[in-house]
Amino acid sequence: MFSYYGSKSKIVQYYPSPTCDKIIEPFAGSARYSLRYFEKDVLLVDKYKVIVDIWHYLQRASEKDILGLPKIDIDFDLSKHVYLSEVEKNLIGFLIADAQSAPSKKLTKKWFSLRPAKIEHRIKGLIDLLPKIKHWKIIQGSYENLKNENATWFIDPPYQFGGEHYKESNKNIDFNSLANWCKSRLGQVIVCENTNATWLDFYPIIRMKGANKFSTESIWTNFKTQYDSIQQDLFGRGNKKECVNVA
């Protein structure tokens, strides 16, 4: 699987399980939540065309296509592979570095020497996911334009503090408007942030170490979870909405 800045790959198991048949990720990125529950009806949405194109490529790709990508070793130079399509170059750019917000243009020997098996592991991960995502719907777009429907909404936007590194960054987000939008969703709503955020009443779920510091991941949800505190239960977080399956 490819690495992406802000991915929930290490902590996805701590988020509430989906209670609806459909999952919608309006800020999809590497879509680790949907991958965990891949058999669901999944809609991925992202404004960043590079990410959407990579997902479309993977949806169409075969194992042969993935294995046909150039071998990546310590001397790998992406610029020499001029025959690759733009989307293949971008996919490889996310394979040869960790937690990037845009595809890397080159592999560093230091990174590779410290992680000699990582590329092979990621290639295997890509092959494993190919049959899992054939039924998904993937579109380029913005959350504001999505139909409100009964679903598990896994909302992981660029963070209020720290989300400036994305190509489609937090600078273009009105967080008050986003908060109201999240509260109005039908079904189950799970919103990701860290504890510095102020635009919803987030509460912590796990503390984790980043490259240079610790941070605490938090969530807001319209369903009761094991992370709820007594104070939050007393003050409430709005109306609870049950999932409704519509034929």
Spans of model-derived segments:
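Anionic group-transfer/hydrolysis microenvironments
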Residues: 27, 48, 158
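Class I S-adenosyl-L-methionine-dependent methyltransferase module
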Residues: 40-137
